Regions:
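Asp-based phosphoryl-transfer active-site loop
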Residues: 1-14, 197
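Active-site phosphate-binding/coordination module
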Residues: 15-111, 209
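Conserved acidic, metal-coordinating active-site core of Asp-based
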Residues: 93-199
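Short structured motifs
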Residues: 102-103, 340-345, 358, 368
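Mg2+-dependent phosphoryl-transfer enzymes with acidic/Ser/Thr/Gly-rich catalytic loops
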Residues: 157, 164-266
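Short, low-complexity N-terminal intrinsically disordered segments enriched in polar/charged residues
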Residues: 257-302
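A solvent-exposed, acidic/Ser-Thr-rich amphipathic alpha-helical stretch
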Residues: 290-353
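Exposed beta-sheet edge and beta->alpha loop/turn motif
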Residues: 349-373
């Protein structure tokens, strides 16, 4: 599980850290792991972020500070979670009581959700407001949780809500269906991520750019917990660092591999080969490939002579011809902000030596994005 805000580094205009993670996940983890995005953002702001940044498609999305859980591309809501959060929750009472605090400034309408009421509050007033508000709401018969994060955001949720509780709910659900993950890595950077690290048997990483309130929580509650680390890398790079630190699996992104030409049939992995192919394609068009003839030869070696590349338009072309056609576009994006990444790489073996691989390919050239399925 990772917070989709923490993986996005707004100080990295080319999104290289995020693209490194994308390549690692799609080449090594997509087919046998679950990618969960957990964010304080509402569905509206989350979808806006996905339009701005090269983010992968998660298997599960947790939004609005753990009050909304959805599944898959269609973001199907978890109705069981909704029913659970309705207990001892009355949004009208919350709105009535918070209106009595002039220190609170209501956030935009998009951030107000069925089980989340969100405000801005000055840092020096936050603790006093939270204490007084909690007392008022308890006196009104509500059981709520008040979360302060980002040095200004104050969210009021049902007591059973939150990123940590949402994760615990999912793990319980997986266990009941005998699908409990072998390992779970929770990643965070703000105060509303703290409870993620309180879930038993979960590995945790605070990225190097974690905010003050999360660092304070760590110092007070988990400083000597070996399952929780403070990474030295920012954002998505910190997640990669944690995967390596806890030995959870491969932690070298294909984007960190200089020579992509080495393809050994005994270690053949179709997902890894697809990721490598489009990394090569990016470098090829940016004129960053040396010894390209050797790479093309190795690429053909792992492709069956009868292999077919099916374009999203439906046009079929032999894999070898598709590889040869690369020669016509070498260096046409040299010096430009051109990046390529793949999403939802899903291989299926259809014969003893045959694979069908479906994926989405994205390209960014300057500010323009395009995709092929």
């Amino acid at each position: 599980m990772r917070d989709n805000m923490l993986q996005v580094d707004h100080h990295d205009p080319e999104n290289l850290s995020l693209l490194r993670f994308n390549a690692l996940w799609e080449s090594n983890y997509r087919n046998n792991s679950l990618l969960v995005f957990s964010t304080g953002r509402s569905p509206t702001l989350y979808k806006e972020l996905r339009k701005e940044k090269p983010m992968l498609t998660p298997d599960i999305t947790i939004m609005s500070v753990g009050t909304e859980i959805t599944y898959g591309n269609s973001m199907v809501p978890d109705n069981g979670w909704v029913e659970f959060l309705n207990k001892k929750w009355d949004r009208n009472i919350v709105s009535e009581e918070t209106s009595k605090f002039p220190e609170l400034s209501l956030q935009s309408e998009t951030e107000q959700r069925p089980h989340k009421v969100s405000f801005y509050v000055q840092k020096d007033k936050a603790q006093d407001v939270m204490k007084a508000l909690a007392t008022r709401l308890q006196e009104r018969g509500l059981d709520v949780k008040i979360i302060y994060s980002g040095g200004m955001d104050l969210d009021i949720l049902p007591q059973g809500a939150g990123k940590g509780q949402a994760l615990a709910y999912l793990l319980k659900k997986f266990k009941a269906s005998n699908k409990l993950p072998v390992n779970t890595l929770a990643c965070g950077d703000s105060g509303n991520d703290a409870e993620l690290f309180s879930i038993p048997d979960v590995h945790g990483v605070m990225v190097s750019n974690a905010q003050e309130e999360l660092l304070q929580w760590h110092a007070a509650n988990a400083k000597n917990n070996p399952k929780i680390i403070h990474a030295t890398e920012r954002c998505a790079a910190g997640i990669i660092q944690a995967i390596g630190h806890f030995n959870l699996g491969p932690s070298t992104s294909p984007r960190d591999v200089t020579d992509l030409s080495d393809s050994k049939m005994e270690n053949f992995d179709p997902a890894y080969e697809v990721v490598k192919l489009y990394l090569f394609y990016e470098r090829w068009r940016r004129a960053e490939v040396e010894n390209f003839e050797l790479y093309l030869a190795n690429l053909k070696a792992v492709c069956c002579l009868s292999g077919i590349f099916v374009h999203p338009s439906g046009i079929e072309q032999s894999l070898h011809d598709a590889i040869n056609s690369l020669k016509t576009c070498y260096g046409d994006k040299q010096g430009k902000q051109f990046r390529v990444w793949v999403d939802q790489v899903l291989p299926a073996q259809i014969g003893s030596e045959s694979w069908l691989v479906s994926f989405k390919k994205w390209e960014q050239s300057g500010e323009a994005w395009s995709t092929l399925y």
